């Protein structure tokens, strides 16, 4: 008897990663993307070594590496004094320790690599204009409802449909995500317009009272990505809203003039109010399962949102490949393998923002002293749990 396809709701990085991993295990996959074409909004993302472990497992390691910019260090600056607090070398010692590099990449460049790999795979069917609104299931199959009125039936539904997941709405039913109160402003500018005095080959983070600022090069050093965040108790959840430079500047008039340059050189500023959810244990409903932001949306302070979705994709593919005739056991193994790690990212990201990046006064002085007294090996030890993780090994 022909095996029913696995349905993936969402054509983002996590959804396409899951499609590739499952197809590489011999499963037919249908990807349902709500947008009229497959693409990614947003700009830069940071990729730890754990992301490259996932790319290699999924068969896109070479393409991902070709799109990446390999920064020399993670650089932490005091936004009030413009002094370096600490840096983490990302050299050969780092790569030897964690088995892979640290890099930054334009989200759209990376997404194109995954789309191409899916398009080239005989077992993957990519469908656009296919917004998932819900599902029904019996003991042997699951039927997905689309906004168009059409339905698609398969063996399993993977809800990789993001922060506002329709699959999660039915599976968990916990309402809208919660606002963090943090507003993030984004801009991408040509590299020649970026100030030479801070045009570093680094992923740089400026830490200040109730704010932080990040910048790094992208797309073969053609542009710089600027992401600045203010804890301004924002309550109205917006995504990609345009605003003026004056509106951005008003949130950062208390910091040193050197990082303030980022606001002045930025163009076409857009704002997002960051949202997440508290960790939830119920990722599974019969033949429906959650992945990525649909399962464990997180704030950006660990720079691990995309990495966690890719790890999910690897883990889910591995457990289903290892349990081809026992879907229930595979899904339980997937959830139990991923739950605590992703919860650590969710909870830890909030704590990093509130209790480390955004502090002032004596708290900031203590932070700077602790960070400044740590060696490269100290940082590597501290990050072992994060960057040394191989999702495929733990799923075996």
Where are the regions that the model predicts?
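C-terminal helical "tail/cap" subdomain of flavin- and related membrane-associated enzymes
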Residues: 1-4, 66, 82, 261, ...
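Conserved N-terminal helical subregion
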Residues: 2-6, 23, 48-190, 233-251, ...
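A structural signal for isolated positions on well-ordered beta-strands in alpha/beta enzyme cores
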Residues: 7, 30, 125, 225-227
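Conserved mid-domain beta->alpha element of the FAD-binding
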Residues: 7-36, 158-159, 185, 215, ...
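Short, flexible helix/strand-to-coil boundary loops that buttress conserved ligand/catalytic motifs
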Residues: 42, 58-59, 68, 88-89, ...
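Short helix-loop capping/hinge motifs at secondary-structure junctions, enriched
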Residues: 191-199, 235, 322
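Active-site substrate-recognition segment that forms the wall
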Residues: 201-236, 245, 252-253, 274
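Flavin-binding catalytic cores
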Residues: 238-270, 327-328, 340
């Amino acid at each position: 008897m022909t095996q029913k396809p696995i349905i993936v709701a969402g054509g983002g990085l996590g959804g396409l990663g899951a499609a590739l991993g499952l197809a590489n295990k011999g499963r037919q996959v249908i990807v349902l993307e709500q947008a009229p074409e497959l693409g990614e909004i947003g700009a830069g993302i940071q990729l730890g070594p754990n992301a490259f472990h996932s790319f290699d497992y999924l068969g896109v390691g070479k393409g991902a590496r070709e799109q990446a910019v390999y920064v020399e260090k993670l650089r932490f600056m005091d936004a009030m004094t413009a002094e370096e607090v600490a840096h983490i070398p990302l050299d050969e010692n780092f790569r030897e320790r964690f088995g892979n590099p640290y890099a930054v990449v334009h989200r759209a460049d990376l997404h194109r690599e995954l789309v191409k790999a899916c398009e080239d795979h005989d077992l993957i069917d990519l469908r656009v204009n296919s917004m998932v609104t819900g599902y029904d299931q019996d003991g042997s199959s699951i039927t997905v409802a689309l906004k168009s009125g059409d339905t698609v039936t398969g063996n399993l539904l993977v809800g990789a449909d993001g922060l506002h997941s329709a699959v999660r709405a039915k599976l968990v039913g916990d309402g809208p995500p919660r606002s963090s109160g943090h507003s993030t402003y984004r801009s991408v500018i040509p590299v020649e317009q970026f100030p030479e005095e801070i045009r570093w080959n680094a992923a740089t983070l400026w830490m200040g009272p109730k704010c932080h600022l990040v910048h790094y090069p992208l797309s073969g050093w053609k542009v710089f990505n600027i992401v600045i965040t203010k804890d301004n108790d924002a309550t109205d959840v917006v995504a990609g809203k345009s605003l003026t430079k004056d509106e951005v500047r008003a949130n950062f008039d208390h910091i040193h003039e050197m990082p303030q340059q980022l606001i002045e050189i930025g163009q076409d500023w857009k704002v997002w109010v960051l949202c997440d959810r508290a960790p939830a244990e119920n990722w599974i409903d019969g033949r429906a399962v959650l992945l990525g932001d649909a399962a464990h949306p997180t704030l950006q302070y660990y720079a691990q949102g995309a990495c966690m979705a890719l790890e999910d994709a690897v883990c889910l593919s591995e457990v289903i490949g290892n349990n081809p005739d026992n879907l229930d056991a595979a899904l339980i193994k997937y959830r139990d393998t991923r739950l605590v790690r992703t919860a650590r990212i969710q909870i830890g990201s909030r704590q990093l923002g509130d209790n480390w990046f955004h502090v002032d006064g004596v708290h900031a002085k203590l932070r700077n002293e602790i960070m400044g007294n740590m060696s490269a090996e100290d940082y590597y030890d501290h990050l072992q749990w994060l960057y040394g993780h191989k999702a495929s090994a733990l799923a075996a």
